[in-house]
Amino acid sequence: SVRPWGDPRAKQVWKKPMAVMVDRYSASASEIFAGAIQDYQRGIIIGQKTFGKGTVQRLDNLTTGQIKITESKFYRITGSGMQSKGIHPDITLPSTWDIEEIGESSYDTALQWDEIRPVRFKKFSMESSLIAQLNDEHLVRVNQSPNLQYILDIRKRYEIQKNKKVISLNLTNRRIEKDERQSWALDIENKRRSSLNLQIFSSYKAM
């Protein structure tokens, strides 16, 4: 059965602009909150796609332990499920790693996304063009921000390491790789600091 939950007597206690930050580790209740803010167009969601936990569990006691049983699912007011898909941000921030490696969608036995009939609700009057404008400005900022470029540099390195097919166990080779890794880390950190007019590090150990 489907049971809608709401509070018709609720009052708006904050009337100024709102932004909610999320990442891949945002799950369950935080996804309900972010999804409601997005669906009501009450504010903008910033960050990365969330975990995608749209289910409710209960623990039953056994003679030798406990068993966790999934007993229900929760949905957005639009009828869209959160399970596996999560909440997609209005403005996406770069990540240093592949967020698809974790989350409900990464589990072989996870319940799949679905949807139900939406409920009636009234949206706030946020202009639809605002998000498009903010995204355009964000893309410019990504290309100009030393901190965001630093994150993208780490992500490139992550992808290279992730796709390596062979890992040497030779001690000499491992030491060479360690020196190269430290040199790379020093280079990108000093590149970021130089762009921000900060004092650069003389060595990896000084970081």
Regions found by a protein language model. Give the residues of each.
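C-terminal "post-core" interaction segments
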Residues: 1-207
